Amino acid sequence: ILNRRKSRAGKSLEHHLETIFKFCDLKFETQVITEEHKKPDFIFPDGASYHNFEFPADDLICLGAKTTCKDRWRQILNEADRIPVKHLFTLQQGVSKNQLAEMYREKVCLVVPKPYIRYFDESFQDKIMPLNVFTGFVKAKQNRL
């Protein structure tokens, strides 16, 4: 039962993010099948662009969504090989300093609601992207296409 609740919470988080991304008029696709049948939560702008090797990899963005990070954040590392920096949205307040350092080394950019940033170690707060900055980042890339 606990796993079903966690799964529902994860799906609910994805649906909330979809609503935000649609409101921001972002182009995205969910559950795109990538290498080795992996399915990142969100690919910006879409799966066709991801699979088109003439489309610049710099204009692709991958976002994983996890209600909590724990060790599961590593799942996003190999979900989209064309995209070197992965973005990870979480609702978890305060990830450990060691885990943040590992994420940073693995080129994972943490994305959280802006009010949550204060719960993270001060030395990493400037590396964490507020959700509103992330949507602006995606929009800026998409406006150049």
Protein language model features and the residues they cover:
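Conserved catalytic cores of phosphodiester-cleaving nucleases, focusing on short active-site segments
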Residues: 21, 42-69, 75-78, 88
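Domain-level recognition of nuclease-like catalytic cores that cleave nucleotide substrates
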Residues: 93-145
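Short secondary-structure capping/turn micro-motifs that flank functional sites
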Residues: 36-38, 44, 119-120
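Acidic-basic catalytic patches of nuclease active cores, encompassing PD-(D/E)XK
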Residues: 1-38
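Short amphipathic alpha-helical segments and helix-helix/interface helices
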Residues: 18, 76-77, 100-101
